């Protein structure tokens, strides 16, 4: 192992590579995914405590991960605040308060040192800023004896390092076990929540009602997840694309695009099904086009339509998901849009949207760097708390907060904050892998000493118990009592723990966006709540 001690880069690459390989192997029916990198790092540093990874790797990886998550989830996050955000945050906050109260009772009963108990809670809740806040608060609460002060300041750090690894593993195992016990069907959950990957098709419908709203308003006013892409009218030889304000007439044949379930509803509300191929007209054509022109990004489709008269965006493919185009939606770099237009204007449509895969790969990095810099600066800001300590969002909370704001904005003038979907996923995966490899090497020495120290084993055991408590509380109350989809509930738990490895695991298991929605909806409040909870616990114990 000496070669890894001497070469930190080799150690980092080896931990990442072995962890990613092990993460693809199934153990007892589930895979750890990228979370396996954490445990490989822990194993390396337990065997040889001198194996280290530069702290900057941990910071950069964490900042990259949360920033790319925030960019992708920004718009949905602020939309959720008006619907499910209060519910999700109430669940997370209640679980943190309950776990802190249980920790106080257990620590008092076992007679653990206050600094050790507070550090143990931060490890069980896997929150580094909370541990740092405890260390910051200690000098004002202990005697002036330098020897005692130095020893006491080490206690929360040691307790944190002992409880942190199981603080991750217990959560992942609890999610895996509860998912099996609850017989979770992730695909069905995603479909019910409207985030599933669904195949979109077209169907011809003859209008038999004379009281329908304007064609562009049909989806909203009739609560249909569809779009009308073409109209056939008696007396007109060709199909035409409906413009803003156009209305239907009796006997019109509409080409309606949507999922099978929504198309069944549309037929019932609009008229009757008409047999025949919906795209048979030779004068109208369609094409899938890559969005690589930045001028088309971050602008609502309702406004964008003025730039493409006579054309219609009917579908947007983002990642593996096909979405029906809605007036309030915005395009992102890398989206694959389906455009309906007169056959002679298809080439013009291709030019308007860019359709350059090479240009996508050569995206502008300046907004990414500026956004990350703003996030780090916000994370450095300190907010005073009672007792002389201060609260800061750190290198996770700051970038996440800024990313959520920029992701919701999409663009500022000519600056596009979003990055291509594929680049976002690549940076996200790289960031979480770097973070887990680095953080895993920090706790090995403490784990090694714990193997022969009964007191350390007690701290590990109690920390694991606290982690189990908060995991069960969130999963059972969230899914069984509050009827939140299990994938979203597990995401809420990952956000409550503020640990990306948990999110990565459940996202890989569910293969939909529900976990990310739950994670981003509670992460900022959970980060602040745990920092305050750890310090309050310390004050109550002393």
Swiss-Prot record:
The chain crosses the membrane at residues 4-23, 28-47, 51-70, 91-113, 160-182, 363-385, 390-412, 425-447, 457-479, 519-541. One of its GO terms (cellular component) is plasma membrane. GO terms for molecular function: monoatomic cation transmembrane transporter activity. Keywords: Cell membrane, Membrane, Repeat, Transmembrane, Transmembrane helix, Transport. It is a multi-pass membrane protein. One of its GO terms (biological process) is potassium ion transport. Its main location: membrane. Residues 190-272, 274-355 form the RCK C-terminal domain. InterPro entries: AAE_transporter, RCK_C, RCK_C_sf, YidE_YbjL. It is found in: Cell membrane. It comes from the Bacteria. It holds the Pfam family Asp-Al_Ex. Belongs to the AAE transporter (TC 2.A.81) family. This is Uncharacterized transporter CE2102.
């Amino acid at each position: 192992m000496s070669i890894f001690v001497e070469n930190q880069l080799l150690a980092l690459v080896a931990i990442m590579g072995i962890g990613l390989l092990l993460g693809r192997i199934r153990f007892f029916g589930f895979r750890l995914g990228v979370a396996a990198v954490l445990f490989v790092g822990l194993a390396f540093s337990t065997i040889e405590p001198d194996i280290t990874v530069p702290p900057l790797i941990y910071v950069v990886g964490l900042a990259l991960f949360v920033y790319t998550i925030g960019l992708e989830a920004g718009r949905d996050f602020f939309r959720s605040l008006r619907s499910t955000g209060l519910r999700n945050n109430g669940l997370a906050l209640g679980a943190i308060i309950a776990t802190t109260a249980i920790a106080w009772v257990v620590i008092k009963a076992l007679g653990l040192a206050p600094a050790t108990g507070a550090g143990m809670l931060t490890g069980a809740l896997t929150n580094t800023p909370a541990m740092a806040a405890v260390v910051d608060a200690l000098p004002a609460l202990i005697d002036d004896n330098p020897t005692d002060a130095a020893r006491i300041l080490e206690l929360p750090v040691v307790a944190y390092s002992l409880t942190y690894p199981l603080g991750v593993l217990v959560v992942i195992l609890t999610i895996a076990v509860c998912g099996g016990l609850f017989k979770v069907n992730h695909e069905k959950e995603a479909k019910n929540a409207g985030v599933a990957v669904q195949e979109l098709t077209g169907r011809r419908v003859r209008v038999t009602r004379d009281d329908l709203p304007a064609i562009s308003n049909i989806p909203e006013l009739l609560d249909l997840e569809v779009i009308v892409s073409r109209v056939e009218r008696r007396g007109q030889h060709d199909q035409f694309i409906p413009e803003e304000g156009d209305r239907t007439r009796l006997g019109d044949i509409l080409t309606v695009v949507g999922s099978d379930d929504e198309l069944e509803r549309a037929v019932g509300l609009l008229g009757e099904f008409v047999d025949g191929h919906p795209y048979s007209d030779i004068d109208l054509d369609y094409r899938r086009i890559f969005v690589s022109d930045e001028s088309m990004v971050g602008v609502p489709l309702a406004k964008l339509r003025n730039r493409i008269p006579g054309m219609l965006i009917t579908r947007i493919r983002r990642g593996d998901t096909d979405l029906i185009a809605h007036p309030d939606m915005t395009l992102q770099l890398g989206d694959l849009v389906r455009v309906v237009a007169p056959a002679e204007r298809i080439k013009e449509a291709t030019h308007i949207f860019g359709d350059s895969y090479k240009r996508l790969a050569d995206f502008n990095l300046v907004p990414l760097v500026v956004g990350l810099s703003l996030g780090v600066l916000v994370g450095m800001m300190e907010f005073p708390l009672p007792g002389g300590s201060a609260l800061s969002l750190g290198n996770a909370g700051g970038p996440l907060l800024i990313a959520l704001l920029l992701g919701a904005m999409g663009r500022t003038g000519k600056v596009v904050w979003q990055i291509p979907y594929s680049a976002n996923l690549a940076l996200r995966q790289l960031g979480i892998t770097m973070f887990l490899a680095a953080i895993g090497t920090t706790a090995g020495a403490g784990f090694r000493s714990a193997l022969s120290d009964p007191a350390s084993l007690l701290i590990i055991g109690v920390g694991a118990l606290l982690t189990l408590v908060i995991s069960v509380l969130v999963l059972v109350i969230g899914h069984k009592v509050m009827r939140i989809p299990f994938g979203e509930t597990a995401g809420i738990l990952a956000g409550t723990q503020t640990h990306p490895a948990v999110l990565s695991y459940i996202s890989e298991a569910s293969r939909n966006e529900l976990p990310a929605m739950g994670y981003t909806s509670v992460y900022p409040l959970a980060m602040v709540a745990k920092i305050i909870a750890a310090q309050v616990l310390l004050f109550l114990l002393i």
